[in-house]
Amino acid sequence: MVHPSAVIFPNVILGDNVYIGAGCIIGAPAEHKAFWDEPTDYKVVIGDNTIITGNVTIDAGTVRDTVIGSNCFIMKSVHVGHDALISDNVTLSPHAIIGGHCEIGEGVNFGMGSIIHQRAKVPKGCMIGMGAVITKNTDMWENGVFVGNPAYFLRANKK
């Protein structure tokens, strides 16, 4: 189901049983000063059974498709930047920001207001604490809990 106030650009491919809530903007051109508002041939691909609640923005790719996996839960006011690759079973809590070109592993859980710098990679099974800031230089490994600004390893994630 797509809420009537959501804006879904023609370059968006939705999987089965996807929910998109009020005020979402999915598939808009990337916001980058070098190529502001220029449409591309790249898409936003959203996997099956993904829930995207209100006021979420997901930008189209500039060099590849922006991909959201299956069974993801994206809460209010999240931003996913251009060319991001988000694996299956990822949770993005309110106000999380995923920069352009980021790669997010399976089952990662982002706390409220967490920020992931462009081109950063977050391995599978990680928990990113509320307000944490992940840079492209943050040393990360699978199933870790990372907190702080800049983020650091706190402990193993006990799923």
Q: Where are these predicted regions, by residue range?
A:
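Glycine-rich hexapeptide-repeat left-handed beta-helix
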Residues: 1, 7-9, 13, 19-46, ...
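Short metal-binding segments enriched for Cys and/or His
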Residues: 81
